[in-house]
Curated annotation (Swiss-Prot):
Family as reported in the entry's similarity comment: Belongs to the rad9 family.
Transmembrane segments: none
KW Phosphoprotein (keyword) present: yes
Source organism: Homo sapiens (Human)
Name assigned to this protein: Cell cycle checkpoint control protein RAD9B
Encoding gene per record: RAD9B
Cellular component, GO, one term: checkpoint clamp complex
Length: 426
């Protein structure tokens, strides 16, 4: 159950959050908890995630409670609100925010779980009331698993400075490249798009390190990501008047755009384009190279004992196995140092995995796809599981080769001897 009341100025901030999330996905989740009301969304390709958390003190009145259902074995079962709304149904309600801020005295939002409806009521001056009944779909919200605090590069800048910079880019711009050094910050058009002769405009914007509230660069980095999500969080940050924090590592690793405020907290996690140079120098690539060296050594030793014909027969009949097989706990802990995360699911199971969150995107001879985004997979989580974590947005889910997770992405399987490598192409 959810009940909350907002004033006119608070409705404007809430509407800006809805508009920012609409740049990511066509649907979003209402996820109330004792920490506040969270709005979450994930795009269809699982390469972008957005979450805005409104603390209880943001609202004039905030009430949330979980339903308790008695089971046959006399054990209480806590049922949390599973509410997924279509963006097309709720976005027109918060379209004219300036008019709503001037004319609305208060806004009331509550849920009717028995009828699967979210009710939004606007109370205008002179006793006028407008009510919207929106049907929702019962669906478990998703939460990304990504620890932004361990990123090598961290920036903090006022949103107005960054908003003035993106004015230089055209409306048709799909991707931008962020290049940083210990002294400079450069935001420019994507290199791939600049090669297109139909797009004659190439923009670059340089900002000195003294213009930032916080500027920490651990290594020179150049990453490429989608431009649409950046514009969305900039619009929202201008409404909250809070600085934007940017966390990132090398290409292929996710980029985090965050707003931390006493009343509102926002996190946008974006996938970045991976290149050959970054994959060769990444910790995952080091692990893969060591793995290949060991497999090559085993094959050389095996070649001394069996004939080439026997090897060919074995390679044809050998069943494909995962790139990282089940190993001892010491091997798993060693791979965790290479950036292996965990994935949370709805039943509360948290499984350790030995694969990196960045998918293996090695070049395939003859492949027509030259640009690859690292794909992010997500596990469904319930509100009660958030209590086991220090932060609601602290980690990014791993890439999985399970049959269920592979339905939303286009995957190729490459066999090399007895090893099977999975990689996602977006």
């Amino acid at each position: 159950m959810l009940k909350c009341v907002m004033s006119g100025s608070q409705v404007k901030v809430f509407g800006k959050a809805v508009q920012a999330l609409s740049r990511i996905s066509d649907e979003f989740w209402l996820d109330p908890s004792k920490k506040g009301l969270a709005l979450r969304c994930v795009n269809s390709s699982r390469s972008a995630y957005g979450c805005v958390l409104f603390s209880p003190v943001f609202f004039q009145h905030y009430q949330w409670s979980a339903l308790v259902k008695m089971s046959e074995n006399e054990l209480d079962t806590t049922l949390h609100l599973k509410c997924k709304l279509g963006m097309k149904s709720i976005l027109p309600i918060f379209r004219c925010l300036n008019s709503l801020e001037r004319n609305i005295e208060k806004c009331r939002i509550f849920t009717r779980s028995d009828k699967c409806k979210v009710v939004i009521q606007f109370f205008y001056r002179h006793g006028i009331k407008r009510t919207h009944n929106i049907c929702f779909q019962e669906s478990q919200p998703l939460q990304v698993i990504f620890d932004k605090n361990v990123c090598t590069n961290t920036l903090m800048i006022q949103p107005r400075l960054l908003a003035d910079a993106i004015v230089l880019f055209t409306s048709s711009q799909e991707e931008v490249t962020l290049a940083v050094t210990p002294l400079n910050f450069c935001l420019k058009s994507s290199n791939e798009e600049s090669m297109d002769l139909s797009n004659a405009v190439h923009s670059e914007m340089f900002v000195g390190s003294d213009e930032f509230d916080f500027f920490q660069i651990g290594m020179d980095t150049e990453i490429t990501f989608c431009f649409k999500e950046l514009k969305g969080i900039l619009t929202f940050s201008e409404a909250t008047h809070a600085p934007i924090s940017i966390y990132f590592d090398f290409p292929g690793k996710p980029l985090a755009l965050s707003i931390d405020d006493m009343l509102v907290e926002a996190n946008f996690i974006l996938a970045t384009l991976a290149d050959e140079q970054s994959r060769a120098s990444s910790p995952q690539s080091l692990c893969l190279s060591q793995k290949r060296k060991r497999s090559d050594l085993i094959e050389k030793k095996a070649g001394k004992n069996v004939t080439g014909q026997a090897l060919e027969c074995i390679s044809k009949k050998a069943a494909p196995r995962r790139l990282y097989p089940k190993e001892t706990l010491t091997n798993i802990s060693a791979l965790e140092n290479c950036g292996s995360p965990a994935m949370k699911r709805v039943d509360g199971d948290v499984s350790e995995v030995s694969e990196s969150s960045v998918s293996n995107t090695e070049e395939v001879p003859g492949s027509l796809c030259l640009r690859k985004f690292s794909c992010m997979f997500f596990g469904a989580v319930s509100s009660d599981q958030q209590e086991h974590f220090n932060h609601p947005f602290d980690s990014l889910a791993r890439a999985s080769d399970s049959e269920e997770d592979m339905n939303n992405v286009c995957c190729r399987k490459e066999f090399n001897g007895s090893d099977a490598k999975y990689f996602c192409i977006i």
